[in-house]
């Protein structure tokens, strides 16, 4: 008997500044605690991807973003659900960032990614973007 897993649509912002990318660390109480990811979150019913990105980045970092083109998509199965992760090239419209709904945030060069434990879906996206996976 096959059971279908719930599909969760997630969007994330790829924000680059001076060759470094903004990543956030999940809170200790979150699903996949303390793992790193590109900033973003779930798309709510009735929202566009751009609206969800603006809402999620504001909620997590207190920052406004301009959502650009879709640059990557991966579908990653977890035990009880599947994450469809859409990565968008975005532009930060705010200079100041605050760790509001994240444990921490960092600007990393792509060569530093392997020094941080990322969520499986984000890791698959990074591998696809960097041509590693």
Question: Residue ranges of each PLM-predicted region?
Answer:
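Conserved Nudix-box catalytic region and its N-terminal flanking loop in Nudix hydrolases
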Residues: 20-60
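Conserved N-terminal beta-strand and adjoining loop/helix that marks the start
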Residues: 1-22, 42
